[in-house]
């Protein structure tokens, strides 16, 4: 069954804290792997040798000595093939840029970051993970790992993790094909001339794609400020549909469907969030997780069952969403039927801009038909050669950023660094 297939691809993990070495997460191959009794992170690593486990630095950018990462304890190899660049705590690429650390554990600083570790000459893959504290693994916007594997078996996924064929993303499934002299992300290769190929497919309009070399931008490819509607009648687009907002404390239960009256629905990507707080809350002994589901999908419609809560503040989103991959004529309609209400817009309207609707009235829950994104705005392809070695070992990585703030790294959000040994 589909459920058993998903179970077969799961790995068990747990977290350990350390003021001296920084927090780490263990990811075990064996589902019955025991908790390791240890006195320090270094003791943990020693006791874990010989076992199929990855020990990964977590929320790295905090101050050293206060659960920020201590690069002096990094050991390259199969036990720590990758490090975490992004999680719900924020972005640890550097001490600049998007997603600063806002947790009460303190600010983001330079010595714990990814770029600091790369400048020390360390070699590692880059990933992201949610650290979601309300029982919702993969919560949208809190971080996810991408894996380049030949199949979705546990062994193939594990081997791809071990060989650093991974990348990081904040939320959207931004696909990055990054090659250097035919090597893939995470590989170490030799050569003076470097053929660089990058192909990025986003879920929304791309802001820019950077190729980073030794901490500096080697090349930047910019996306459009405003997507341009393509010529012709039939268009391939991605349209994000958001559900949420409102002022009330109670959850809104969304039941209904999204459908097309013309054209074809190629796919539906979930953007489902867990609760935007640590659970259980003070005074509570348990917390009920509201599970969001894509109930069904065919080439014309998708049925959804979702729960949204009000946004806890003006900078933290709690909406639920899906992204529709559609191919349809401009006069074709995208129809939303939820909780007894029906709203519809043509693709032509959505190519001009977004449209929103309150379900009951002002300050009630709402549906947002986001601007339709044609292929030209969410795809970037670039080829170049770099013939100037700068160090004994130069490092490269790619980062992609969408205009909606989503990243991946190999960086978009964040892209995995591919490292070249000269």
Indicate residue ranges for each PLM-predicted region.
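Extended, charged catalytic domains and RNA/DNA-binding interfaces, predominantly
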Residues: 1-414
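A short, hydrophobic C-terminal helix/tail in secreted or cell-surface proteins
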Residues: 415-422
């Amino acid at each position: 069954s589909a459920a058993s297939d998903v179970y077969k691809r799961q790995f068990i993990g747990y977290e350990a804290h350390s003021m001296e070495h920084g927090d780490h997460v263990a990811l075990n191959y064996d589902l019955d792997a025991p908790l390791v009794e240890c006195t320090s992170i270094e003791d943990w690593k020693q006791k874990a040798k010989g076992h199929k486990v990855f020990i990964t630095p977590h929320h790295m950018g905090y101050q050293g000595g206060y659960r920020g990462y201590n690069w002096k304890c990094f050991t390259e190899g199969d036990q720590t093939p990758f490090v975490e660049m992004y999680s719900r705590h924020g972005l640890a690429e550097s001490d600049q840029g998007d997603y600063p650390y806002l947790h009460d554990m303190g600010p983001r600083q330079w010595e714990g970051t990814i770029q600091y570790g790369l400048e020390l000459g360390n070699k590692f893959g880059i990933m992201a993970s949610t650290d979601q504290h309300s029982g919702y693994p993969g919560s949208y916007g809190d971080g996810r790992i991408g894996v380049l594997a030949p199949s979705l078996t546990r062994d193939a996924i594990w081997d791809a993790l071990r060989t650093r064929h991974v990348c990081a993303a904040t939320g959207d499934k931004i696909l990055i094909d990054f090659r250097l002299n035919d090597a893939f992300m995470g590989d170490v290769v030799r050569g003076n001339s470097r053929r660089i190929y990058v192909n990025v497919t986003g879920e929304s309009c791309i802001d820019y794609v950077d190729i980073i070399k030794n901490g500096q931008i080697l090349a930047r490819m910019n996306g459009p400020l405003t997507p341009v509607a393509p010529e012709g009648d039939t268009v391939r687009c991605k349209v994000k549909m958001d559900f949420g907002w409102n002022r009330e404390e109670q959850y809104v239960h969304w039941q209904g469907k999204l459908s097309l009256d013309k054209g074809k629905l190629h796919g539906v990507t979930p953007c489902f969030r867990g609760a935007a707080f640590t659970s259980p809350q003070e005074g509570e002994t348990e917390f009920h997780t509201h599970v969001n589901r894509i109930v069904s999908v065919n080439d014309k419609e998708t049925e959804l069952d979702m729960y949204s809560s009000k946004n806890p503040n003006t900078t933290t989103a709690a909406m639920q969403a899906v992204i529709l991959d559609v191919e349809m004529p401009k006069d074709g309609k995208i129809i939303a039927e939820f909780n007894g209400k029906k709203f519809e817009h043509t693709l032509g309207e959505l190519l001009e801009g977004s449209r929103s609707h309150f379900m009951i009235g002002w300050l009630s829950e709402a549906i947002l038909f986001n601007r339709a994104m044609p292929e030209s705005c969410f795809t970037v392809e670039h080829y170049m050669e770099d013939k100037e070695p700068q160090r004994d070992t130069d490092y490269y990585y790619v980062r992609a950023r969408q205009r909606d703030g989503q990243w991946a790294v190999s960086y978009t959000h964040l892209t995995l660094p591919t490292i070249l040994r000269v």
